[in-house]
Amino acid sequence: MKCDKHTMLLYAVTDRAWTGRETLRQQVEDALKGGVTCVQLREKELDDAAFLQEAMELSALCRSYGVPFIINDNVEIAIKCHADGIHVGQEDMAAADVRAKVGPDMIIGVSAHSVEEAQLAVAHGADYLGVGAAFSTHTKTDVDVLPEGRLKEICDSVDAVSYTHLRAHE
């Protein structure tokens, strides 16, 4: 699948802490039925075997809806589950190294917090940027919120699709 403004229109990032009584699969399917255009599986607590199992299941689910499925931070899992893409942060594998490992067809997303990080990521093969955080979030409590105007500066500096963290009630 290709990365464009339409596939990134409503980008859902999973958070097991919010599942409540539903399974993560149920929540992802509800999101897909509700119009989500891209799903990122973000798992920080699962071992690789459990992560791969969940990734395989959600990858198949997203494929059945024609929606890109992205793995957060784990290139090996992304390759093994035939994900449509991989998202890496600044402290993870560099975009150029990811591109060399996954080839030209997998979508690569990179977190960026400055114009310089954004431009470097795009120059090294990123298809989209995760920019932010624009607001404080419950999923990333240690992150600094971007200064006013920074999101626009970053978006204006690159030719790539960008997203930022928005709260559901905003």
Please tell me what each predicted stretch does.
Residues 164-170:
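Conserved small/polar residues in nucleotide/adenosyl-binding loops
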Residues 1-85, 90-92, 101-126:
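Conserved N-terminal beta1-alpha1 strand-loop-helix module at the mouth
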Residues 89-163:
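Conserved anion-binding
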